[in-house]
């Protein structure tokens, strides 16, 4: 089946409504929305700007807000005014990686059912890149990048979009609960476990 090269008005409206439902934000710019789905391979063959800059922006927005949300959840000021982390740095890193990785982002795109709307060049179409995990993850990042630019970098919009699209609060709670439940307490690690649970 040959892919369409451009969205029609009905496609744009459908995607806007779906993205609003999943992120809490309605993208105003139809051009930016189309660009989020336009791969470089198409732009080389035809015309227009690709989604690469939106992908880059979305990657940075995701990274920042996921770290912020984990930090808000797992860190606090102590009596001395120091920032006290309830988790170690290596756990923080692995937690962030578990929450945001290519497989997770691709699975969200699959759940949304929108990879078929990617606008690709002939070589990408032939190789069915729209089915590749990395390409789907890039699409997710592009959508977040469009939300950032379209909202004029509104921090409330961005945090809400990241929380909602990743189901971050529920997933974070589940991961932390499962990790703490799987810890075994013995003489060697009892103090560490108690500190982390405090």
Stretch-by-stretch model annotation:
Residues 1-198:
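Double-stranded RNA-binding/processing signature
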